[in-house]
């Protein structure tokens, strides 16, 4: 991270976005992740940023909006949410497209339950433009929450959501800076980001395998995984109910493995 980097607080970031007349979009949050849009409302001036918020907690209500799903806290569910919300936004507000950078943020989250018998984790995604009228980009990530309190996990998730939206508009030129900024306002060890993918016309030059390596390098996660096609994977999902054989290897360079 640059020595000139100044960490900015959650409220300041949210207010900065709210006061930028070019950035306008929607938030869709299902499950326990209901804190991201709340940060923008609390900062003031939210009418300059928020066109729509959708909040669903009951599974049947969620199904009525996004269709039935076998798993709710999963990447396919997140992608369905982003697709629906961004299409709806760009269709309904097409008259603004010449001066607006649209975005649709979504998350689907499970936080620690009352009995603390589960593990808090969630999927977060953002489809966004970096200039008015341009094709959209996408940022998708998976988080594991380590706070031993459900409310603390929700608040941490809310901060990451603000950091995502602020980061793509201010740090997209520097992937490592963007990655580190996602944890602004969060103490060490509270959140683990074990998968992150950037895609779209403004990120064609980005190799997401190297993004995964940066997550490990910067201590944001302990392991990175990607398939033979180069696509990054969320390890626990990819290895679920699989028989695993591990062989020691070396990476020279990082994009090739030698066994």
Model-based region annotation:
Residues 1-251:
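Non-catalytic terminal extensions that flank enzyme cores
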